[in-house]
Amino acid sequence: TVKXQLSMVLDLNKEIGGQTXTAA
């Protein structure tokens, strides 16, 4: 579902943001 995908995307964003130090 869209909700599930959105949750996954947000989780990925959090992981990437933590690695780069910057989150958009």
Swiss-Prot record:
The keyword 4Fe-4S applies. Its main location: cytoplasm. Optimum pH is 7.5. One of its GO terms (cellular component) is cytoplasm. Heterotrimer of alpha, beta and gamma subunits. Binds 1 [3Fe-4S] cluster. Binds 3 [4Fe-4S] clusters. It comes from the Bacteria. Disulfide bonds: none annotated. This is Chlorate reductase subunit beta. Keywords: 3Fe-4S, 4Fe-4S, Cytoplasm, Electron transport, Iron, Iron-sulfur, Metal-binding, Transport. It is found in: Cytoplasm. It comes from Stutzerimonas chloritidismutans. GO terms for molecular function: 3 iron, 4 sulfur cluster binding; 4 iron, 4 sulfur cluster binding; metal ion binding. Electron transfer subunit of the chlorate reductase. Its cofactor is [3Fe-4S] cluster; [4Fe-4S] cluster. The keyword Ribonucleoprotein does not apply.
